[in-house]
Amino acid sequence: MRIDIMTLFPDAVEAMMGSSIIGRARERGFVTIQTHQIRDYTTNKQMQVDDYPYGGGRGAVMQADPLYRCWQHICDEAGERVHTIYMSPCGRVLTQQVARELKAQYDHLILVCGHYEGVDQRFLDECVDEEISTGDFVLTGGEIPAVSYTHLRAH
């Protein structure tokens, strides 16, 4: 089983997955978890990943281009298009049953952690297969939901 996590905070994600059951599962080779710093896929020297929404709207969203380049890099390494989940408050609610269904269907997943007001809709339309929510509340980013899902999946 492999999970790739696209995030602005890979160190935080790694810290939450370096010990306990997940850490042991990684050490024993039961699960491969790779974090990807989205800023590494920018083309500007400031490594900026946010911008105003295409077509207008309030706040800033994560730009489509660095997200797409990161996603494409993961798919190229895998040699195929990988099922991609955006951790979103608008998605279907994550339950044990949802985790079981995804585990039965996919050996490799990409989890996308959003920030700001969300992710550019063009990236969602082009690359994301489904959106998953951990509940009816707002967090500062998608890292905690991604780690929660990973714990469910690896347990």
Residue locations for each model-derived region?
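N-terminal nucleotide/polyanion-binding subdomain common to many enzyme families
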Residues: 1-75
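Short amphipathic alpha-helical face segments that pack within enzyme cores
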Residues: 62, 66, 144-149
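S-adenosyl-L-methionine/SAH cofactor-binding core of RNA-modifying enzymes
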Residues: 63-115
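Short, glycine/polar-rich helix-capping loops at beta-to-alpha or helix-loop-helix junctions
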Residues: 117-124
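Surface-exposed binding/hinge segments that line
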Residues: 136
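Conserved small/polar residues in nucleotide/adenosyl-binding loops
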Residues: 150-155
